[in-house]
UniProtKB/Swiss-Prot annotation:
Name of the protein this chain belongs to: ATP synthase subunit beta
CC per GO annotation: plasma membrane; proton-transporting ATP synthase complex
Membrane topology category: Peripheral membrane protein
Cell compartments where the protein resides: Cell inner membrane
GO molecular function: ATP binding; ATP hydrolysis activity; proton-transporting ATP synthase activity, rotational mechanism
SUPFAM superfamilies per UniProt: C-terminal domain of alpha and beta subunits of F1 ATP synthase, N-terminal domain of alpha and beta subunits of F1 ATP synthase, P-loop containing nucleoside triphosphate hydrolases
EC number(s) recorded for this UniProt protein: 7.1.2.2
Assembly behavior: F-type ATPases have 2 components, CF(1) - the catalytic core - and CF(0) - the membrane proton channel. CF(1) has five subunits: alpha(3), beta(3), gamma(1), delta(1), epsilon(1). CF(0) has three main subunits: a(1), b(2) and c(9-12). The alpha and beta chains form an alternating ring which encloses part of the gamma chain. CF(1) is attached to CF(0) by a central stalk formed by the gamma and epsilon chains, while a peripheral stalk is formed by the delta and b chains.
Entry-linked PROSITE patterns: ATPASE_ALPHA_BETA
HAMAP family linked to this entry: ATP_synth_beta_bact (MF_01347)
Entry keyword set: ATP synthesis, ATP-binding, Cell inner membrane, Cell membrane, CF(1), Hydrogen ion transport, Ion transport, Membrane, Nucleotide-binding, Translocase, Transport
Biological function: Produces ATP from ADP in the presence of a proton gradient across the membrane. The catalytic sites are hosted primarily by the beta subunits.
Length: 458
């Protein structure tokens, strides 16, 4: 094992000099002997000097400290021993429960499955969340993006999805917290514990306060753990919160390495970095990875290069809108902006497709009529339009749903709504079977029968 010495430290970037015939390869892990800090090789500068990114704080590092090359990339524990544990980017436990005991360790830099190994499927994954199951259904082995600005409920939606899928489908999940709040990571851990699903989730955190190296690589750490389960023949769920922070960490690293920035200050390698991660999140003939990624949208601008690059990789997009959150409708999913490739009569069936398009049609018409109502009032509308508006307002409220993970805030018990009940309920509203009920009866209920019960008490 060759050893070198530190020649320069600039923030998270550390230059290390090795003998010229023993220069480590790109992505190899190096270890600073005295403090056990891991460095990852990013560039070879010539004359035996490599430029590395520190996977931890570089405070107190000094020139000419000894560094050892490991001769291989960063490797992390994989297998059942990771379930129920909180780990950092290096796979080290941070939950004070002792070492993570697994038989194998895998390197975090792996190539994507070949074209021949990949498998496409059109099987639906039921989430129990009405608006998602009806309007932007998830495919097993697909990629889903939760788009939203600050504070519209991306993390809460993600927590609800993990809870529902772990309790209803009994599958394994891997959660990668990329540059999010430590408080959220803590809440998340306790939420999983209280729901008794912690033993089915592996948690990997690289939070906001950590150096950019950790935040850039933590998604790969989580993904490597998920790939192991997939290659065992399982159907895995991979949650990444937040993919924007992955891009942001890449921007910081890129600037520290001295690369020229591109549009809006992002790294010139934005598309390639995103592709490297996304192409590995895929289903093979042995097992599947279904991924749900929260995507922070800077200043609510969907054309920003980061969310725009992410869009290209997704099968379904769930757009969380501030305007809907302001109405008090949660989950604040925009029913007209959210899309899914699975919403096709050949995949979901004629009835589901027609009900979904019917719901969107009514909401679209209501959107068009809103200006007229604002200027002239409801009385100027035709009878047909009045009926459309009344139904649209009921549908809008009925798209809300009490969440299990939000019970502590709302005081209302959570609801899991099976897909067949969702379709039947919306079909009944569209067919006018509930035109006689007041619209507030439809707010924060599960099925339409609950709305009818609620109406009796209003």
């Amino acid at each position: 094992m060759s050893s070198g010495k530190i020649v320069q430290v600039i923030g998270a970037v550390v230059d290390v000099e090795f003998p010229q015939d023993q220069v480590p390869k790109i992505y190899d892990a190096l270890i600073v002997d005295e403090r056990g800090l891991t460095l990852e090789v990013q560039q070879q500068l010539g004359d035996g000097v490599v430029r590395t990114i520190a996977m931890g704080s570089s405070d107190g590092l000094k020139r000419s400290e000894k560094v050892s090359a490991t001769g291989k990339p960063i490797s992390v524990p994989v297998g059942k021993g990771t379930l129920g544990r909180i780990m950092d980017v290096l796979g080290e436990p941070v939950d004070e429960k002792g070492a993570v005991e697994t038989e194998e360790r895998w390197g975090i830099h792996r190539s994507a499955p070949s074209f021949a190994e990949q498998a496409g499927g059109a099987e639906l994954l039921e989430t129990g969340i009405k608006v998602i199951d009806l309007l932007c259904p998830f495919a097993k082995g697909g990629k889903v993006g939760l788009f939203g600005g600050a504070g519209v409920g991306k993390t809460v939606n993600m927590m609800e999805l993990i809870r529902n899928i772990a309790t209803e489908h009994a599958g394994y999940s891997v959660f990668a917290g990329v540059g999010e709040r430590t408080r959220e990571g803590n809440d998340f851990y306790h939420e999983m514990k209280d729901s008794n699903v912690l033993d089915k989730v592996a948690l990997v955190y690289g939070q906001m306060n950590e150096p950019p190296g950790n935040r850039l690589r933590v998604a790969l750490t989580g993904l490597t753990m998920a790939e192991y389960f997939r290659d065992e023949g399982r159907d895995i769920l991979m949650f990444i919160d937040n993919i924007y922070r992955y891009t942001l960490a890449g921007t910081e690293v890129s600037a520290l390495l001295g690369r020229m920035p591109s549009a809006v200050g992002y790294q010139p390698t934005l598309a390639e970095e995103m592709g490297k991660l996304q192409e590995r999140i895929t289903s093979t003939k042995t097992g599947s990875i279904t991924s749900v990624q929260a995507v922070y949208v800077p200043a609510d601008d969907l054309t920003d290069p980061s969310p725009a690059t992410t869009f290209a990789h997704l099968d379904a997009t769930v757009v969380l809108a501030r305007g809907i959150a302001e109405l008090g409708i949660y989950p604040a999913v925009d029913p007209l902006d959210s899309t899914s490739r699975q919403l096709d009569p050949l995949v979901v069936g004629e009835e589901h497709y027609n009900v979904a398009r019917g719901v969107q049609g009514v909401l679209q018409r209501y959107k068009e009529l809103r200006d007229i109502i604002a200027i002239l009032g409801m009385d100027e509308l035709s009878e047909d339009d009045k009926l459309t508006v009344a139904r649209a307002r009921k549908i809008q409220r009925f798209l809300s749903q009490p969440f299990f993970v939000a019970e502590v805030f709302t005081g209302a018990p959570g609801k899991y709504v099976p897909l067949k009940d969702t379709i039947a309920s919306f079909k009944a509203i569209l067919d006018g079977e509930y035109d006689h009920l007041p619209e507030q009866a439809f707010y924060m209920v599960g099925t339409v029968d609950e709305a009818a019960e609620k109406a009796k008490n209003l």
